[in-house]
Amino acid sequence: MKLIHDVQEMQQTVLGLKRQGKRIAFVPTMGFLHEGHASLMREGRTRGDVLVLSIFVNPTQFGINEDLASYPRNLEGDCALAESCGVDLVFAPTAAGMYPPGFQTTVALGPLTKPLCGASRPGHFDGVAVVVTKLFGIVQPDCALFGKKDFQQLAIIRQMTLDLNLPVEIIGMPIVREPDGLAMSSRNSYLSVEQRQQALCLHRAILKVRELFKGGETSVDRLLGEARMIITAVPEASVDYLELRDSTTLEPVATAAADSLFALAVKIGSTRLIDNTVLGDTP
């Protein structure tokens, strides 16, 4: 496995591989890898001749009062996990390398960015779109793998790739959970032992909404009301959003259906966690 920091070196390396006819699978991350990332890497290993992992804490997708400075980093540990998952190339650029002096290009996105995380994190998805477009240009992947925990991000990247005719197959992978149901996230490391227990309210809310829907409940107000009661009963929990949306368009739904997305963002103390489920999907 090779670790590359320089943008031009990475680009030349993959262009050489492409000339040899190699199929490149790509897993873009912000590092501090966990089993969720490992599932993406292992799947990527089966989908390409060469597996590339990027590790880059992208400053343009963090807001002014967000956790850019404190976001957890562990390049040595990340590289060890990557190697165990069969990664061939790790691309870990610097912010200066990705955004040199004079950088000014943006990617204008459409209505998929407006609700959910887009409403509470203005500018976030603009930053995601720019860095993903740049990474696709540098790595030249045939396919790229993203987790469904960031459901809105996945939808936006699919749409952007389609609209801009980027020759990359976008693969969404299931959420990976801890044994007690908490969705794996690098930000879980911020939680105290007590907060870690409180964070289980997100999964409890998902289970309750799924249970009620399976029992025939389709009222959006009743489903979200039950979920909200579960969250607000937890001392340090505060709701950012709890919503039912169409899983394709992310538009609001009048009544819940099998293809409805239940998505939530909750702060446990100062740590913002997200989770989701499509009601008709196998959990």
Curated annotation (Swiss-Prot):
EC number of this enzyme: 6.3.2.1
Function: Catalyzes the condensation of pantoate with beta-alanine in an ATP-dependent reaction via a pantoyl-adenylate intermediate.
Similarity-based family: Belongs to the pantothenate synthetase family.
Keyword Cytoplasm recorded: yes
Species whose genome carries this gene: Trichlorobacter lovleyi (strain ATCC BAA-1151 / DSM 17278 / SZ) (Geobacter lovleyi)
Binding partners and assembly: Homodimer.
GO molecular function: ATP binding; pantoate-beta-alanine ligase activity
GO CC term (a single one): cytosol
Keyword field contains Ligase: yes
Pathway the protein takes part in: Cofactor biosynthesis; (R)-pantothenate biosynthesis; (R)-pantothenate from (R)-pantoate and beta-alanine: step 1/1
Miscellaneous comment: The reaction proceeds by a bi uni uni bi ping pong mechanism.
Alphabetized InterPro entries for the sequence: Pantoate_ligase (IPR003721), Pantoate_ligase_C (IPR042176), Rossmann-like_a/b/a_fold (IPR014729)
GO biological process: pantothenate biosynthetic process
Protein's UniProt name: Pantothenate synthetase
Active site: residue positions: H37
Compartments, record wording: Cytoplasm
NCBIfam families assigned: panC
UniProt keyword list: ATP-binding, Cytoplasm, Ligase, Nucleotide-binding, Pantothenate biosynthesis
Catalysed reactions, as listed in the record: (R)-pantoate + beta-alanine + ATP = (R)-pantothenate + AMP + diphosphate + H(+)
Any Pfam family the entry gives: Pantoate_ligase
